[in-house]
């Protein structure tokens, strides 16, 4: 009905094998397999990096906490000057 039947796919596969040969197709298949394997490896290595700290020297602080510390330091400086 408009779709491709199994026989049509089989004929296309035979034509491709005749055009390129089994050796070339085997090489393409192994290249494709290694590319997929490398992609999966890169994805699996990237996931633990999300849990790790981004920078060892950087500790994120809230702006409110930083402002409170600044106000406390100013109060201590005022007391020392007085």
From Swiss-Prot:
Subcellular location: Cell inner membrane
GO molecular function, one term: protein transmembrane transporter activity
One Pfam family cited in the UniProt record for this chain: TatA_B_E
Protein's gene: tatA
Function: Part of the twin-arginine translocation (Tat) system that transports large folded proteins containing a characteristic twin-arginine motif in their signal peptide across membranes. TatA could form the protein-conducting channel of the Tat system.
GO biological process, one term: protein transport by the Tat complex
Protein name: Sec-independent protein translocase protein TatA
Keywords, sorted A to Z: Cell inner membrane, Cell membrane, Membrane, Protein transport, Translocation, Transmembrane, Transmembrane helix, Transport
TM ranges: 1-21
Cellular component terms (Gene Ontology): TAT protein transport complex
Location of region: Disordered: 46-82
InterPro entries found in the cross-reference section: TatA/B/E, TatA/E
Membrane topology of this protein: Single-pass membrane protein
Family membership: Belongs to the TatA/E family.
Organism expressing this protein natively: Aliivibrio fischeri (strain MJ11) (Vibrio fischeri)
Subunit-structure text: The Tat system comprises two distinct complexes: a TatABC complex, containing multiple copies of TatA, TatB and TatC subunits, and a separate TatA complex, containing only TatA subunits. Substrates initially bind to the TatABC complex, which probably triggers association of the separate TatA complex to form the active translocon.
